[in-house]
Curated annotation (Swiss-Prot):
Signal peptide: none annotated. It is found in: Cell membrane. The gene is psd. This is Phosphatidylserine decarboxylase proenzyme. Catalyzes the formation of phosphatidylethanolamine (PtdEtn) from phosphatidylserine (PtdSer). One of its GO terms (biological process) is phosphatidylethanolamine biosynthetic process. It comes from the Bacteria. It catalyses: a 1,2-diacyl-sn-glycero-3-phospho-L-serine + H(+) = a 1,2-diacyl-sn-glycero-3-phosphoethanolamine + CO2. Its EC number is 4.1.1.65. The modification Pyruvic acid (Ser) is found at S184. Its main location: membrane. It comes from Aromatoleum aromaticum (strain DSM 19018 / LMG 30748 / EbN1). It is a peripheral membrane protein. Keywords: Cell membrane, Decarboxylase, Lipid biosynthesis, Lipid metabolism, Lyase, Membrane, Phospholipid biosynthesis, Phospholipid metabolism, Pyruvate, Zymogen. Its cofactor is pyruvate.
Length: 215
């Protein structure tokens, strides 16, 4: 296992929110005392924990598909991949507001294509979120020629999908490529014949949990 890239322990996406929460807590603490400022210190602590982005051990098995997000497994099913029009195995991870919201590549590979779809903002724990909600999809191709589709899905509260790569980019497994704020979902479509290594309800960690094994 290895950690293949450096990054701050607090996600850059959260720095403005952390700074504002800290400033408000300090101002109220100075003006009115700790008692009045306590709710704002608690808010500051919540914001810090929300935007935490810890390094993770990264399994290096050639056929391993890693979880792209922290959260809970809400779907494992054979479906038609709507992006590549093929039979596939779909595994979905639901992220609540207490999970780390950094998204990381499930495999080593090249970004073949990227698609953005505008949509609704229904509860991301529901299956219909995969086809109705705002979403951003990446088509990744591994060195062995396997195609993996990784889809960031906005949720009821999360209405900001951030993706930092385009077609032609190379991603290492576990590499950070995006972020979704305040609860959301990530769907992974794998080649037919892939074997799931998780079950419904399992808690998973981005980069360190093995979701499945490629054929």
């Amino acid at each position: 296992m290895s950690n293949n890239y450096p990054h701050p322990l607090l996600a850059r996406e959260g720095w403005p929110f952390i700074a504002i929460a800290l400033a408000v807590a300090l101002v109220i603490n100075g003006a009115a005392g700790f008692g009045w400022a306590l709710p704002f210190w608690l808010l500051f602590i919540f914001v810090v924990q929300f935007f935490r982005d810890p390094p993770r051990p990264i399994p290096q098995g050639a056929k391993d598909v890693l979880s792209p997000a922290d959260g809970r497994i809400v779907a494992i099913e054979p479906v038609r991949d709507p992006y590549l029009d093929r039979d596939s195995v779909k595994i979905s991870v639901f992220m609540n507001v207490f999970n780390v919201h950094s998204n990381r590549s499930p495999v080593d590979g090249e970004v073949v294509a990227r698609w953005y779809n505008a949509g609704r903002f229904v509860n991301a724990a529901l299956d219909k979120a995969s086809v109705e909600n705002e979403r951003n999809a990446l088509h990744l191709r591994t060195r062995d020629g396997h195609d993996v589709t990784c889809v960031q899905v906005a949720g009821l509260i999360a209405r900001r999908i951030l993706c930092y790569v385009e077609a032609g980019a190379s991603l290492a497994r576990g590499q950070r490529y995006g972020f979704i704020r305040f609860g959301s979902r990530v769907d992974v479509y794998l080649p037919a014949g892939s074997r799931a290594r998780v079950t419904i309800g399992d808690k998973v960690s981005a980069s360190s949990t093995i979701l499945a094994e490629l054929p």
